[in-house]
Amino acid sequence: MVKIGNIELPDFPLLLAPMEDVSDPPFRRLCKLHGADLMYSEFISSEGLIRDAMKSRKKLDIFDYERPVGIQIFGGDEEAMSLSAKIVETVNPDIVDINFGCPVKKVVSKGAGAGVLKDVDLMVRLTKAVVNSTHLPVTVKTRLGWDVDTINIEEVALRLQDAGIKALTIHARTRSQMYKGEADWEYISKIKQNPNIEIPIFGNGDIDSPEKALEYSQKYACDGMMIGRAAIGYPWIFNEIKHFFETGEKLPEPTISDRLLAVKQHAEWSAEWKGERLGLIEMRQHYSNYFRGISHFKEFKTKFLQVLSLEEFYQLLEETEAFYKNRIEI
């Protein structure tokens, strides 16, 4: 068992990463259904929460079926982070997470996300501001450092633990790498070998198969893994990893029927959450991901992108299923 404060997770939990415009309630619900043990919201601007910005407030939506769930906030101002932690607490998530890892320029330029990696003292102050403003367990997601010459994750891990966080997720790249090159998990291993580290350490970066998950779990001895991009359009990865850990065998790849069911559930939940029209418009970014590598889907993609009602959507699902059934690929 792995504990984050008072939150109990199974041995070697699998976490869904907080991903902007992806990790919303419908997607989290689907990942929970397919084996994710702990999920995080899309990251939320502390300044946006304080301004009561509609987009930021909408990201606070959480539901009992997805627990345990954490809400992730980011910012570079101590007072704003403190106030936003108090706002987050009002919706009663299980965890408050701080983003010190987002490498995107618009976030970094505000001195937030991975931008804070340049100033560990500020990182500690921001963390303490959140820890002291909530009774909920506080976790952090960060990177190895700003660039290869300033990797400071070993110092950061100790200082954030001392600041009161209950778990740390490390994306094993620097900010300058963005999402390029290979993640260097050796630093995660070094932190786990430090006898002064008592909090759970979760690894993140490049986990895209059950085989790699098992290899990295054995080689780097982390307490669990966070999965992000590999889950987009493929929520089955969580149960696939768990099954492989338990049996050493791979589950069959999802069939066309499995993929169509996942798309149906995702779209229905999206429509339920945001309204039929907007929910289906936001689904447009997901269709290609669910059918990545499936021959002839391009013929249906254009039609899916034009759907604006569930009635049209259901008709197109039936048409798609019939096409693949006739090709004996379902």
Identify the meaning behind each predicted range.
Residues 1-330:
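Flavin-dependent oxidoreductase catalytic cores
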